[in-house]
């Protein structure tokens, strides 16, 4: 694949639209041709389908030259066996190809599943073919490869001629039919079947509360949902909730807080002897499993849940009683497993598997390293993050344009020449190194500007080799070009301090900040509505799942309260869920809110934020200020869902993020927006954002306070840069002091001379 190093800007809607939203190999190939069919994909209850994009292909596969290939991986769940599979291939190809000599081969794990001819009549137009994939080719871990073989003339040809191309759309669809396998009732299989890393689909895991949950039960459930959310990672996770009702199909987590034996829809829960974990079959579905988490009180229920999320690798058996669970050390700020460490340089080998750091070919795809930066890195007047890149490459005998490209989030950062043997400096020493393995070790240091990064960023390194043409009938591609990045290459953000202007819903959306500053959420609290139902519970668990996705650590220390107890968590960052009149804080804190909804009456503040491109954030917070300058009030029965951020009225420096809707189901729109996806063209930004279906409208960006800490010298620089008057005064006083010292020194010297 050829990755695009340059970013594509996203269009932004105008303010008027925002207001409107408020209102409303040939031999084998020939043998495999019989596997090709043209019937449409049929949906079945025992299978699923995934696009190549869902399997990790971000863009179109561009296959060029006389022979090229690209691939994606797909895996099969541990509790499923494959009955059959099809690939609905969407592709196009060059009109210049010779039909008798050109084809696209579909391979699974190196075996040809089908060979598609490329006739003249279909050239240059979108094509679709349904390829039958034999079930025996599919194993637990699989590689689906698309190989293009192309020729445009019977005589001598240029192997990289521009007419040799085929494109595979990433909307091509892999459909798999499966049969379930019953797993044993053993806690040792956890996190299976509730999460399987081989499944690329979004996780949907029901939670069942045996009785109406109290705060402790919600804290236990939050730890579990954040654990699953962290495992789900890029897939996303939702947690539909019921009270006392088991799902008709599939898996679920059941939380039971009772001192006595009880029955839950046919599931007999024995009288607990302490925090208990039990794995059983779902009585409604023999292929489903129930993880029953039991405690005699809230403390025991939380201990049982924490035992699952922290100790699942050592659990075994159908049922266990947790006798002790100790926390050996408290979490430290910014130590989330998913975040780039800010107290030491980090090796690239810690962020990506070593085999993914090597590529081959003249124009291979980019080596992409995913990294999550702490969202509050203060980058004012900082040159950038030092990247010490160690790499090896195969030097060509002669070349002029071979280079190593370094990019960040599809933006070009630096180009480094890859000199040929004839252009190498270093004489015999370098040539001696080449004799060892025909690759040459090199090193380069560059600075990556944080202003070009987001909390979820992608470092891209791409080797590009110059193809030297020898002349007609002499050109041939020898696939001996190799490039690799040393896993000991380092990124170092230790020079950055933590300081950020708030409120900022963008960093909440991307990283759950400021709640995720401590990975276990020990300085965070969730304020639930007074009379919450299953919609509010689902929203709460889904948001906690998002926090787990951001940190990679379960929220074992989150506090859950209601409005009447909010003073008890005054020293914490607060996530407030509100539906209609169920949240008293909407009235108590009305003066701090940029939006309100009371029945049919809705009021929103507006600014010029929608007119700005928010994909770029200035390192100067003043440039990001878009305070409210307009207000609108209207009546309507439609659903109104919004997110707002503001400083906590209970303690300065603490933050509140409010997720509100005039209808309980509206909270699910907000949580879906946090998960995001292809249906969402915009993301949540600013200090006020409205969600209408898949449309997100960020209305206000009013950053009023700061969280974090700067050292004294940096803080003084920052403050003086923000206040011209103070800078002039300090400059004047400094000049006065220096002038006075010079005057006194000269006067003393004159007195000594006269004496």
UniProtKB/Swiss-Prot annotation:
InterPro entries: Cell_synth_B, Cell_synthase_bac. Its main location: membrane. The chain crosses the membrane at residues 724-744. It is found in: Cell inner membrane. Pfam families: BcsB. GO terms for cellular component: plasma membrane. Pathway: Glycan metabolism; bacterial cellulose biosynthesis. Keywords: c-di-GMP, Cell inner membrane, Cell membrane, Cellulose biosynthesis, Membrane, Transmembrane, Transmembrane helix. The keyword Transmembrane applies. GO terms for biological process: cellulose biosynthetic process; UDP-alpha-D-glucose metabolic process. It comes from the Bacteria. It is a single-pass membrane protein. Binds the cellulose synthase activator, bis-(3'-5') cyclic diguanylic acid (c-di-GMP). Tightly associated with the cellulose synthase catalytic subunit. Belongs to the AcsB/BcsB family. This is Cyclic di-GMP-binding protein. It comes from Pseudomonas fluorescens (strain SBW25).
């Amino acid at each position: 694949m050829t990755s695009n190093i340059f970013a594509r800007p996203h269009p932004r809607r105008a303010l008027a639209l925002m207001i409107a939203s408020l209102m409303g190999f040939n031999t084998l190939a020939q043998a495999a041709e019989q596997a090709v069919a043209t019937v449409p994909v049929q949906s079945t209850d025992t299978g699923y389908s995934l696009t190549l994009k869902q399997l990790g292909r971000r863009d179109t596969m561009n296959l060029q030259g006389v022979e090229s290939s690209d691939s994606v991986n797909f895996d099969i769940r541990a509790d499923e066996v494959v009955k059959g599979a099809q690939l609905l291939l969407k592709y196009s190809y060059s009109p210049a190809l010779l039909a008798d000599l050109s084809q696209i081969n579909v391979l699974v794990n190196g075996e040809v599943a089908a060979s598609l001819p490329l006739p003249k009549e279909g050239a240059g137009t979108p094509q679709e073919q349904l390829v039958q994939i034999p079930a025996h080719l599919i194993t637990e871990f699989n590689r689906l490869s698309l190989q293009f073989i192309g020729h445009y003339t019977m005589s001598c040809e240029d192997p990289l001629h521009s007419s040799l191309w085929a494109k595979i759309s990433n909307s091509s669809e892999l459909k798999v039919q499966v049969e379930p396998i019953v797993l044993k009732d053993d806690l040792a299989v956890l996190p299976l079947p509730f999460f399987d890393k081989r499944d690329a689909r979004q996780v949907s895991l029901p939670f069942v509360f045996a009785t109406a949950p109290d705060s402790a039960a919600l804290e236990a459930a939050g730890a579990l949902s954040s654990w699953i959310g962290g495992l789900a990672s890029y897939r996303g996770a939702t947690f539909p909730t019921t009270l006392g009702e088991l799902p008709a199909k599939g898996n679920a987590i059941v939380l039971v807080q009772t001192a006595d034996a009880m029955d839950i829809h046919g599931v007999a829960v024995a009288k607990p002897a302490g925090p208990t974990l039990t794995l059983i079959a779902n009585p409604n579905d023999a292929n489903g499993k129930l993880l029953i988490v039991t405690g005699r009180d809230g403390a025991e229920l939380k201990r049982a849940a924490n035992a699952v999320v922290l100790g699942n690798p050592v659990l075994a058996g159908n049922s266990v009683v947790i006798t002790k669970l100790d926390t050996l050390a408290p979490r430290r700020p910014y130590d989330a497993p998913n975040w780039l460490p800010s107290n030491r340089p980090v090796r690239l080998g810690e962020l990506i598997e070593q085999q993914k750091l090597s590529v081959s070919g003249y124009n291979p795809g980019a080596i992409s390293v995913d990294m999550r930066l702490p969202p509050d890195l203060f980058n004012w007047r900082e040159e950038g993050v030092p990247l010490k890149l160690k790499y090896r490459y195969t030097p060509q005998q002669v070349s002029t344009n071979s280079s190593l490209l370094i990019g960040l989030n599809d933006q070009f950062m630096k180009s480094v020449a890859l000199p040929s043997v004839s252009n190498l400096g270093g004489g015999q020493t370098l040539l001696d190194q080449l004799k060892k393995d025909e690759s040459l070790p090199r090193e380069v240091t560059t600075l990556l500007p944080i202003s070009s990064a987001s909390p979820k960023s992608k470092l891209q390194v791409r080797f590009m080799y110059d193809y030297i043409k020898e002349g007609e009938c002499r050109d041939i591609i020898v696939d001996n070009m190799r490039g690799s990045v040393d896993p000991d290459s380092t990124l170092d953000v230790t020079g950055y301090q933590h300081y950020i202007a708030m409120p900022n819903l963008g960093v909440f959306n991307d990283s759950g900040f400021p709640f995720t500053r401590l990975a276990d959420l020990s300085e965070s609290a969730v304020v639930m509505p007074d009379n919450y139902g299953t919609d509010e519970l689902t929203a709460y668990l889904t948001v906690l799942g998002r926090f787990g996705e951001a940190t990679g650590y379960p929220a074992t220390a989150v506090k859950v309260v209601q409005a009447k107890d909010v003073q008890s968590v005054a020293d914490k960052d607060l996530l407030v869920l509100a539906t209609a009149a169920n949240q008293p804080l909407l009235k108590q804190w009305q003066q701090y809110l940029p939006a309100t909804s009371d029945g049919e009456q809705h009021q929103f503040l507006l600014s010029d934020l929608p007119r700005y491109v928010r994909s770029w954030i200035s390192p100067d917070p003043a440039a990001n200020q878009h305070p409210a300058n307009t207000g609108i009030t209207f009546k309507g029965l439609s659903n109104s869902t919004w997110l707002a951020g503001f400083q906590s009225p209970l303690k300065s420096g603490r933050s509140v993020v409010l997720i509100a809707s005039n209808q309980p189901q509206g909270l699910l729109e907000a949580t879906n927006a946090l998960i995001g996806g292809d249906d969402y063209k915009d993301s949540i930004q600013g200090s006020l954002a409205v969600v209408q279906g898949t449309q997100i409208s960020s209305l206000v960006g009013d950053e009023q306070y700061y969280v974090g800490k700067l050292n004294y010298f940096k803080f003084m620089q920052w403050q003086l840069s923000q206040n011209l008057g103070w800078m002039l005064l300090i400059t004047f006083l400094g000049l006065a002091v220096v002038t006075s010292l010079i005057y006194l020194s000269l006067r003393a010297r004159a007195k000594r001379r006269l004496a």
